Design a protein with these regions (language model features):
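Twin-arginine (Tat) signal peptide motif
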Residues: 1-9
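Zinc-dependent deaminase catalytic domain
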Residues: 9-13, 17-20, 30-435
């Protein structure tokens, strides 16, 4: 996995009437002071600095310096803040991917869905999520799924949904495009860009300072450099690995995955990019025995072993899709194995990044819904770079949803931000030979 969500970050041209903002320095950022009050914000600048402080928390913990805050739009009351938590530190030193979906915005939406009734929180339309960087496809789709307003500080011209700074969201299909236009706003910057987008966001009539904008960029780029230097090597090629399914020494690896998925390593296909009927039957059975589930996703390692699979839990949490749970399960189990001195060596001899494996959907995502686009974005966040090999695809499915055609599913990919369309080259493919 190439975990860098926004390695090629630059600040795009400003919105209409604004000035271009140059790329931020990758030197040492100035210390980010703690807000005087993290319980309430009183304007756009204090909201932006709260998000910046949250981003710094992510960087300080060894992950990316991107963060967000969830506030009541009318009052400025802060409900929650979340930094990026994709990476965690290891007991032996260095960092490792723990959850490829743990971007701040996605975590905020999962928290809101889990706490809304218990805490009596206001409706999504009365809330604003402010984020230090334009949301990636996964996070934007999570925000659209819930229906909150979104205030953005800095543009991301590589993976952000407003990557071209036009505010048209032409990279998204309808009805997502119209929904983004109605809920996403980009704060004006003193001496720089004009406001762009929806006026429904908190403090839409107030600008932020260029210093805060610059600090958001510097915090991210510096943290990305630190992640690259601190992360433990994780992308071993299959030729250098030992098949855990046939290696008696890998029993602890197998048992770790069987805790949540008892069938782990009991199915092995001849070619890892050619799922067979047994994989289909396993996913169908998983849905059948999971109350309320309608979909399941499995992960095949480069040796063809069905390592893990998950059914969706969307009745519990809309963002608990089968893919999100599956990719999270693989990453977190792998992290735990690498983080233990007893299993570190065998884990590194047996497991590698998902780019070398295959994700198999029982039913492909519906790209015309925010939930479906969430899965496509989460796949991109998981991979971070091209699959190896690229053909056959590492993104496969047995069935299509409703009236969606294979052509429509692929056509949605082409306009997506460069990370997804040019780098990863996401290419959903129907499983061959299984009816």
């Amino acid at each position: 996995m190439n975990p860098t969500r926004r390695d090629l970050l630059t600040w795009g041209a400003a919105a209409a009437g604004g000035l271009a903002l140059s790329a931020c320095s990758t030197g040492n950022p100035k210390p980010v002071p703690s807000p005087t009050d993290t319980g309430v914000v009183t304007g756009a600048e204090s909201l932006a600095t709260l998000a910046l402080w949250t981003a710094q928390r992510g960087a300080d913990a060894g992950s990316y310096g991107i963060g967000g805050a969830l506030v009541e739009s009318a009052t400025g009351r802060v409900l929650q803040t979340m930094p990026n938590r994709v990476f965690r530190t290891l007991s032996a030193g260095g960092t490792f991917v723990d959850d490829p979906t743990a971007h701040g915005e996605r975590q905020l939406m999962s928290w809101y869905l889990a706490q809304r009734e218990t805490l009596g929180l206001v409706s999504p339309g009365e809330l604003t999520v402010v984020t230090t960087l334009d949301p990636c496809l996964m996070c934007a789709s999570a925000l659209l799924t819930v229906g909150v307003n979104v205030g953005v500080i800095a543009i991301d011209d590589y993976s952000g949904v407003n990557y071209d700074s036009s505010g048209s969201f032409a990279d998204l299909p309808e009805p997502l495009r119209g929904q983004a236009t109605a809920t996403f706003g980009y704060y004006a910057v003193d001496g720089g860009r004009a406001f762009q987008g929806s006026r429904a966001i908190a403090y839409a009539d107030q600008p932020i300072t260029s210093d805060t904008l610059d600090a958001c960029g510097t915090t991210y780029t510096t943290s990305a450099d630190q992640v690259r230097s601190a992360r433990r090597a994780s992308g071993a090629t299959p030729a250098t690995l030992t098949d855990p399914g046939t290696n008696p020494a890998a029993i602890d690896v197998i048992r770790a995955f069987q805790v949540e998925f008892p069938e782990a390593f009991t199915i092995r296909v001849k070619e890892p990019r050619q799922p067979d009927r047994r994989v289909y039957d396993a996913l169908v059975d998983l849905v059948r025995r999971s109350p309320g589930a309608t979909n399941a996703v499995g992960f095949l390692d480069p040796f063809g072993n069905l390592v893990t699979a998950r059914a969706d839990q969307r009745e519990v949490n809309t963002l608990s899709t089968a893919f999100a749970l599956c990719t999270r399960a693989y990453a977190q189990t792998r992290y735990a194995l690498v983080n233990s001195a007893a299993t570190l060596t065998i884990a590194e001899q047996s497991l590698t990044n998902p780019n070398y494996g295959t994700f198999v959907f029982l039913q492909a995502p519906d790209p015309f819904t925010p939930e479906g686009m969430f899965d496509i974005g989460a796949y991109g966040s998981t991979m971070g770079g091209a699959a190896m090999p690229a053909i056959p695809s590492a993104f496969q499915y047995f069935d299509l949803p409703g009236s969606v055609t294979a052509r429509q599913l692929q056509d949605v990919i082409y306009p997506l931000p460069p990370l997804y369309s040019d780098n990863i080259k996401i290419s959903p493919q129907r499983v061959v030979g299984v009816n």
